[in-house]
């Protein structure tokens, strides 16, 4: 039995946890669009596809519910063309794209999340409709080309237009509409493997009447009011494809800075071809001047070199194309190397042995490259001992060699190779190489104090390799321990003095670096290498870098600072401070963290705590903000009908909120409410007293009155505790004229001034009346009507019919709901969406008549379908009704009260709701009376347990 009572207790705690969420709810989302979509009769798109004309403005709104207020994010997946939504997302309820283009079509997703449950995601597909100008191209049958291009030949006219939706084509000859089969000499067809993309008009064995003006009309059936577009082509016996010629050489070799002009002329073609210039790679230079078929580049550079093509097109046959290559002279990158006698293993230059000097440059064009050799300023010619050669361009382009056979003392001196281009206009490159007894191969060493090299993160460091020898070669630096890039992003860095300078050193740069000699500007021998070790010290990396801790007075708090990484890791010390006050110091042993605790918080214990963990390179810091400030309130945005109007120019607003983590700090004693009119500077403030503790998820309501229509107001709410002010939160409230609520969910308790947009029927006999028990006439008829609204409140409002005189039996009062709009049915999709319609009704009195509910469907003809009916005395209680409805178009609900035979026949309704989805089965099957809603959830869950206890208790 004790186990059973324990089970009851556990279940009660669980249910309290569930109900403790209060109004907190995971997000729901729905997408609506402003304006009307372009409808296609035969397509019948569902509401999840939105069609829009190119160039117009797309506006999609994401309607969300959920508490706390969900964060909204719009994203997009590509449609027919890849588009990444400008590589960004939109964090706003409304997505607005002005001048929408075709590539912006696709599926748009709205994602809402507030940390409760799973994110809510809805999508809508956007189709962008457009129609480009059609283009007609003309071709003759293959293999029949002769001088008279179209004389007694078969001709094909192809019409193409880009569009969405698919285009429909029609042909005309003059004013005559051409149809398949209307003329034996004409055939109209679509090519294989196309889907309405083109339409071909085939003229078989041209006849005299076929020489005429042809028109192709492209149409998308006026979808989105896109007009038809037409293109015409005049076919004659002179119609011919284009031909051109270039009035320039190929290739064209020029010097940098010169102006160049390319001329392209047409030699044939009817109609007259259009001429365009293109470049084989990339676009034309920005400075290019185009004038018809003439292209001018004022001051050419090496970057402008390449192949330029002139293209002529008149939509007859294939376009004509002629090309020329522009070469811009250039000489660059002069370098040399010395190769000792290859038949000896010695790398040194010695008397009596062979030595070879090589020079290399990059030349454009390579055919114009020439080399000249000099010794001590005097020209050298090839001889038996001084052999001058040029390396095969396929092996080593732009390279010349001077072989000195049997080196003699008299051969010592300065040798110069000069590279030049035959065309001139480019400065020569001169390279000097000294051959003497002091010319020796290189050697690399690392100074003793330069490896290992210790530095700190963020410093500037120089890695050094000393190079000896003559001449001194270029030094190449690279990473020796791993295949990673050097600081400049390349795999190797060049140095002319053996020094590698690194700015802003990072910890990732620690490791071994290799310096090695290059063959250029030195000896062509096996590279010399040396290694330099770099050690980068960095201060400790710690977590958390910053943490806010909110805690009430007289409570304890513990702060912990953890070391993630540090170098050097040894001799780590720490110190705790509150502001400038030193609290504690110490040294790490084997642990990776340090803690500081405050057993009982008071005013002097609040503030910023800093924990510094220190090594040779510096300090890492954890910061803790310990505060007693209350968290910000969370405004509730899902209030049903928050705006109501009591006077002509004045409106009121029901402001609701919850308190985030109310138990985190001391009890909230009041809220400071600030309000100011939009655009004004001054805040009007007042305090709202709070009695007792606020529960998590508890909804707090405060009515803002005397607001001026149609002004918007900024509202600021700040919680107050004995610590002081907490975090503020701000929202804007706006007056909006009553509109039809979104059908996702509708609830009306008739509490506001506009009674949720319900209206009286002008064709009935009398009206429904808004009333509460507290405001009803003191001369009311006894023994009929409710004593409170359906929640049990004497101040709550409901709608009722007064059946006292002069009302007569059978007279009707009809109350009309707002018009609810739904999306048109998709004939190829699922069935219509179901909605659960529910309301409370009160029928007490001996003369009760009838209460009917009708579903009025909007269309070309208005139809009223009986939905629900009840009659007779139901007792002094509120009853609930649930009905599933399946509207196929916009609809209204009509409450019709019919007066009974006497004055004790008042009928009332309250809490009308419409929710998407079918009603629960138990709701449809139950019509129980309801006196209040408090505790129902717990009582229902506990009922089986209580029954079980009552059965088992006698057995004890």
Swiss-Prot record:
Keywords: Cell membrane, Disulfide bond, Glycoprotein, GPI-anchor, Immunoglobulin domain, Lipoprotein, Membrane, Repeat, Signal. Residues 1-25 form the signal peptide. Disulfide bonds join 62-110, 159-216, 264-310, 359-417, 465-515, 561-611. This is MAM domain-containing glycosylphosphatidylinositol anchor protein 2. Glycans are attached at residues 92, 213, 237, 434, 443, 504, 610, 703. Residues 638-739 form the Fibronectin type-III domain. It comes from Homo sapiens. Interacts (through the Ig-like domains) with NLGN2. Residues 932-956 form a propeptide. It is a lipid-anchor; GPI-anchor. The gene is MDGA2. May be involved in cell-cell interactions. It comes from the Eukaryota.
């Amino acid at each position: 039995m004790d186990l059973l009572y324990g089970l009851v207790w556990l279940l009660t705690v669980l249910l309290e946890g569930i109900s403790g969420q209060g109004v907190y709810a995971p997000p729901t989302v729905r997408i609506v669009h402003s304006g009307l979509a372009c409808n296609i009769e035969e397509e019948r798109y569902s509401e999840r596809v939105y069609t829009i004309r190119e160039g117009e403005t797309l506006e999609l709104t994401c309607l969300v519910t959920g508490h706390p207020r969900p964060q909204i994010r719009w994203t997009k997946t590509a449609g027919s063309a890849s588009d990444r939504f400008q590589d960004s997302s939109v964090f706003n309820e409304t997505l607005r794209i002005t001048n929408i283009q075709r590539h912006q079509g696709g599926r748009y997703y709205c994602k809402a999340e507030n940390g409760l449950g799973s994110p809510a995601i809805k999508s809508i597909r956007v189709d962008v409709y457009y129609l480009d100008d059609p283009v007609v191209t003309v071709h003759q049958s293959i293999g029949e080309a002769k001088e008279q291009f179209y004389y007694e030949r078969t001709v094909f006219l192809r019409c193409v237009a880009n569009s969405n939706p698919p285009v429909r084509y029609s042909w005309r000859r003059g004013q005559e509409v051409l149809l398949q089969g209307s003329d034996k000499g004409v055939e109209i067809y679509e090519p294989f493997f196309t889907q309405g993309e083109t339409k071909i008009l085939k003229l078989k064995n041209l006849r005299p009447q076929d020489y005429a003006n042809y028109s192709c009309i492209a149409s998308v059936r006026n979808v989105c009011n896109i007009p038809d577009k037409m293109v015409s082509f005049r076919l004659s016996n002179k119609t011919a494809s284009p031909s051109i010629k270039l009035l320039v050489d190929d290739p064209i070799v020029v010097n940098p800075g010169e102006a160049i002009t390319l001329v392209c002329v047409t030699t044939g073609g009817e109609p007259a071809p259009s001429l365009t210039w293109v470049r084989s790679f990339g676009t034309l230079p920005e400075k290019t001047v185009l004038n018809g078929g003439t292209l001018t580049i004022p001051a050419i550079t090496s970057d402008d070199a390449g192949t330029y093509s002139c293209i002529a097109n008149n939509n007859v046959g294939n376009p004509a194309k002629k090309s020329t290559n522009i070469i811009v002279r250039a000489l660059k990158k002069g370098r040399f190397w010395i190769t000792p006698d290859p038949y000896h293993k010695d790398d040194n230059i010695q008397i009596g042995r062979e030595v070879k000097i090589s020079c290399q440059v990059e030349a454009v064009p390579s055919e114009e490259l020439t080399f000249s050799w000099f010794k001590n300023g005097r020209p050298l010619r090839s001889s038996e001992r001084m052999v001058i050669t040029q390396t095969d361009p396929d092996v080593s382009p732009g390279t010349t060699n001077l072989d000195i056979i049997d080196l003699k003392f008299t051969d010592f001196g300065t040798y110069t190779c000069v590279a030049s281009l035959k065309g001139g206009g480019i400065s020569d490159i001169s390279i000097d190489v000294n051959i003497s007894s002091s010319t020796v191969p290189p050697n690399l060493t690392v100074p003793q104090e330069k490896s290992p090299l210790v530095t700190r993160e963020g410093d500037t460091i120089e890695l050094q390799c000393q190079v000896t020898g003559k001449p001194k070669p270029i030094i190449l630096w690279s990473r020796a321990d791993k295949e990673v890039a050097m600081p400049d992003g390349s795999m190797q860095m060049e140095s002319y003095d053996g020094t590698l300078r690194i700015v802003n050193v990072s910890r990732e740069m620690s490791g071994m670096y290799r310096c090695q000699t290059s063959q250029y500007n030195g000896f062509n021998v096996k590279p010399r290498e040396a290694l330099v070790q770099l050690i980068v010290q960095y201060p400790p990396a710690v977590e958390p870098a910053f943490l806010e801790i909110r805690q009430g007075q007289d409570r304890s708090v513990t702060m912990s600072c953890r070391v993630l990484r540090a170098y050097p890791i040894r001799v780590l010390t720490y110190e705790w401070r509150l502001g400038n006050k030193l609290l504690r110091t110490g040294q790490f042993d084997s642990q990776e963290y340090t803690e500081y605790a405050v057993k009982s918080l008071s005013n002097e214990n609040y503030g910023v705590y800093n924990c510094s963990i220190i090594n040779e390179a510096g300090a890492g810091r954890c910061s803790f903000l310990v505060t007693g400030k209350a968290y910000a309130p969370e405004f509730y945005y899902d209030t049903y009908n928050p705006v109501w109007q009591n006077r002509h120019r004045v409106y009121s607003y029901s402001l609701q909120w919850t308190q985030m983590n109310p138990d985190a700090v001391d009890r909230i004693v009041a809220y400071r409410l600030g309000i100011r009119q939009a655009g004004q500077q001054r805040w009007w403030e007042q305090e709202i007293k709070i009695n007792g503790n606020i529960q998590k998820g508890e909804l707090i309501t405060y009515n803002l009155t005397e607001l001026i229509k149609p002004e918007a107001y900024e509202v600021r709410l700040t919680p107050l505790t004995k610590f002081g002010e907490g975090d503020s939160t701000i929202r804007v409230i706006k007056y909006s004229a009553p509109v039809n609520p979104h059908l996702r969910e509708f609830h009306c308790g008739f509490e506001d001034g506009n009674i949720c947009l319900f209206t009286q029927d002008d064709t009935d006999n009398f009206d429904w009346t808004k009333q509460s028990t507290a405001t009803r006439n003191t001369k009311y008829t006894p023994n009929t009507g409710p004593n409170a609204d359906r929640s049990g409140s004497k101040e709550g409002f409901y709608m009722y019919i007064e059946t006292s005189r002069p009302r007569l039996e059978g007279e009707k009062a009809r109350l009309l709901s707002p018009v609810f709009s739904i999306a048109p049915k998709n004939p190829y999709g699922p069935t219509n969406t179901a909605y659960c319609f529910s309301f409370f009704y009160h029928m007490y009195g001996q003369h009760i008549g009838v209460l009917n509910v009708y579903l009025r469907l909007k269309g070309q003809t208005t139809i009223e379908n009986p939905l629900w009916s009840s009659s007779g005395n139901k007792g002094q209680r509120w009853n609930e009704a649930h009905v599933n409805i399946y509207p196929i178009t916009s609809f209204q609900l009509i409450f019709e009260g019919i007066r009974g035979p006497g004055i004790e026949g008042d009928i009332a309704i309250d809490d009308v709701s419409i929710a998407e989805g079918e009603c629960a089965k138990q709701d449809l099957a139950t019509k129980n009376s309801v006196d209040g809603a408090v505790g129902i959830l717990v009582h229902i869950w506990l009922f089986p347990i209580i029954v079980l206890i009552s059965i088992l208790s006698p057995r004890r």
